[in-house]
Amino acid sequence: MRASSKKKVLVFDSGVGGLSVFQEIHRLLPHMDYLYLFDNEAYPYGELDQDVLITRVNKLVAALVEEHQADIVVIACNTASTIVLPSLRANLSIPVVGVVPAIKPASLLASQGVGLIATPATVTRQYTHELIRDFAQGKPVELLGSTRLVDMAEEKLRGESISLSELESILLPLRNKVDVAVLGCTHFPLIKEEIHQALGGEVTLVDSGEAIARRVKALLLNAMKQESREEGSKKIYASAPPWQEDALNTCLANLGFNPVQVYRLPGV
């Protein structure tokens, strides 16, 4: 990695959910330069063949890392993290940080039971069940997979209102069964307040954002001679023209980003 004072962080996701992870990292490291790429052309990742996903993510991330000389990559997507991290780490010479559902910290907090709210792909993946087996501390874990929650988070980011009654209906299987719930998709912290309300207001919600931010900070600051005190730049890219682009850009401006640029990579 470069020894300059200003480091570049590349955050990658299939949609805008990874912005919740970006916010946590930026809170700890406001003086870094940030690149955000969301692969909306292939969204949602849970429906992609595994080999296609591995090839696609490796090509996109490697190209952007080389073009912008990124110092660290954050895969802010649970589906991609469980499948692509080994190949990315083998192919890149910089650190790659992924997302893991926060089963262990949630289990330590729970007295009644743990709920895992994620995408259908995540709740059925063997990796997730291995996490539960190894880290659930003997606590019962209720699994709830929903793609609609992902869409709701995307809609909220574009200024649309969330139907609390619809949310309550989706989350009904967890009511009165858990006292801690894991937000197992990076989209879900974007609607954290609504989820908390829909679950009755007494369920503790846990996600991986803060832990990822601490990991990124540790890796970057160890490689820096001196931390910059100037506000970093923020650029955001999409692999296809985004849905409701004007509304999205309004929200992104509030986070300090310039308007979305379309990033096309031949052969992907």
Swiss-Prot record:
Chain residues that bind substrate: 13-14, 45-46, 78-79, 186-187
Key words, A-Z: Cell shape, Cell wall biogenesis/degradation, Isomerase, Peptidoglycan synthesis
GO biological process: cell wall organization; peptidoglycan biosynthetic process; regulation of cell shape
Reaction(s) catalysed (UniProt annotation): L-glutamate = D-glutamate
Biological pathway: Cell wall biogenesis; peptidoglycan biosynthesis
Domain of life the protein comes from: Bacteria
Keyword Cytoplasm: no
One Gene Ontology MF term: glutamate racemase activity
Gene3D superfamilies assigned to the protein according to its UniProt record, in alphabetical order: 3.40.50.1860
Residues at the catalytic site: 77 (proton donor/acceptor), 185 (proton donor/acceptor)
Catalytic activity, EC: 5.1.1.3
InterPro entries xrefs: Asp/Glu/hydantoin_racemase (IPR015942), Asp/Glu_race (IPR001920), Asp/Glu_racemase_AS_1 (IPR018187), Glu_race (IPR004391)
SUPFAM superfamilies the record matches: Aspartate/glutamate racemase
Residues that span the membrane, as ranges: none
Similarity comment text for this entry: Belongs to the aspartate/glutamate racemases family.
Role played: Provides the (R)-glutamate required for cell wall biosynthesis.
Full protein name: Glutamate racemase
